[in-house]
Curated annotation (Swiss-Prot):
One family name in Pfam for this protein: Pribosyltran_N
Keywords: Acetylation, Nucleotide biosynthesis, Phosphoprotein
GO cellular component: cytoplasm; protein-containing complex; ribose phosphate diphosphokinase complex
Tissue expression profile of the protein: Ubiquitous.
Gene name, Swiss-Prot/TrEMBL: Prpsap2
Record-level GO BP terms: 5-phosphoribose 1-diphosphate biosynthetic process; bone development; purine nucleotide biosynthetic process
Keyword Acetylation: yes
A GO molecular function held by the record: magnesium ion binding
The keyword Mitochondrion is annotated on this UniProt entry: no
Record note on quaternary structure: Binds to PRPS1 and PRPS2.
UniProt name for this protein: Phosphoribosyl pyrophosphate synthase-associated protein 2
Modification sites for Phosphoserine: S219, S227, S233
Post-translational modification N-acetylmethionine, affected residues: M1
Lineage: Eukaryota, Metazoa, Chordata, Craniata, Vertebrata
Length: 369
């Protein structure tokens, strides 16, 4: 015999099952800053949680309020210690899972290890490993922004919303660069030409592509595995069969395809980390007659001596979003400017919580964007 709950009780249960909890998974103050901006836009309080490290360097997470039956959104930005950042996220996700959260959505504006999404030599595809770990920990949905390769979405067996920062960067160009009509969009390597083309078509501007030895090493898709010569044996290949080999690559001297003389050059990319290739591109553009040089990217990792090198370079301004904390780098280099993207993250959270369509956030976005 089955027991059916009265309709009025069913309604009450559905209401009590609702509720949104917003956590910051990082003890870093910069992550808290982004989390608070999102919370203010949503009109909710930050969830109560303690994230800290024990004296033995183990990460401990203590959730201090009930998450049972609630939609939990965990915001995590990548700090300097990326591995600790990942452990904080995984432990918090698992804690919410074991506390019977209805759904656990990770808000990770910059997906760590995204550069390691291809097989290199005898290495591994680390971003695939990280995706598997997140799913295993209990993540049910992921919100991220401008994945280094869109194919990373396929590493997950949960829904992934890969938001775009380009509308905010395009708005910055139109509002903060008065004579942007006299600009040309520049791809610092052929690998980033599609992104540059997307910016150029939307701003109705020309495009230039830098090609040559300053090209980003990551675009070199050589597999790189080398083995010792095969020992001659009965099982060895027949001497009359010669397998054709690829001709070794030789990068030409650096060249600019397109006219930048007397114009503003705006270099666009998704990540700015090691700045050597950007500096080489800026020097080349200056030599070709560009009178002002901007660099625009979604994720400003700005590792090592990047702020100092930018400050001493021909680059006039570097514009990045706040997907990654970079307050210290801004103090070291006044040329670095920040665009706030908390608005789109807040709207994504609101829509997912309310069960609304996400298509509004992907308007006019093509396959190449």
């Amino acid at each position: 015999m089955f027991c059916v709950a009265p309709p009025e009780l069913e309604t009450k249960m559905n209401i009590t099952k609702g509720g949104l909890v917003l956590f910051s998974a990082n003890s870093n103050s910069s992550c808290m800053e982004l989390s608070k901006k999102i919370a203010e836009r949503l009109g909710v309080e930050m969830g109560k949680v303690q994230v800290y490290q024990e004296p033995n360097r183990e990460t401990r997470v203590q959730i201090q309020e009930s998450v049972r039956g609630k939609d939990v959104f965990i915001i995590q930005t990548v700090s300097k210690d990326v591995n600790t950042t990942i452990m904080e996220l995984l432990i918090m996700v698992y804690a919410c899972k074991t506390s019977c959260a209805k759904s656990i959505i990770g808000v990770i504006p910059y997906f760590p290890y995204s550069k390691q999404c291809k097989m290199r030599k005898r290495g591994s595809i680390v971003s695939k490993l990280l995706a598997s770990m997140m799913c295993k920990a209990g993540l049910t949905h992921l919100i991220t922004m401008d994945l280094h390769q869109k194919e990373i979405q396929g590493f997950f067996n949960i829904p992934v919303d890969n938001l775009r920062a380009s509308p905010f960067l395009l708005q910055y160009i139109q509002e903060e660069i008065p004579d942007y009509r006299n600009a040309v969009i520049v791809a610092k390597s052929p690998a980033s030409a599609k992104r540059a083309q997307s910016f150029a078509e939307r701003l109705r501007l020309g495009i230039a592509v830098i090609h040559g030895e300053a090209q980003d090493a990551e675009s070199d898709l050589v597999d790189g595995r080398h083995s010792p010569p095969m020992v001659r044996s009965v099982a060895a290949i027949h001497p009359s069969l010669e397998i054709p080999m690829l001709i070794p690559k030789e990068k030409p001297p650096i060249t600019v395809v397109g006219d930048v003389g007397g114009r503003i050059a705006i270099i666009v990319d998704d990540i700015i980390d090691d700045v050597d290739s950007f500096l080489a591109a800026a020097e080349t553009l200056k030599e070709r007659g560009a009178y002002k040089i901007f660099v625009m990217a979604t994720h400003g990792l700005l590792s090592s001596d990047a702020p100092r090198l930018i400050e001493e370079s021909a680059i006039d301004e570097v514009v990045v979003t706040n997907t990654i904390p970079h307050e210290i780098q801004k103090l070291q280099c006044p040329k670095i400017k920040t665009v706030d993207i908390s608005m789109i993250l807040s709207e994504a959270i609101r829509r997912i919580h309310n069960g609304e369509s996400m298509s509004y956030l992907f308007r006019n976005i093509g396959l190449d964007d």
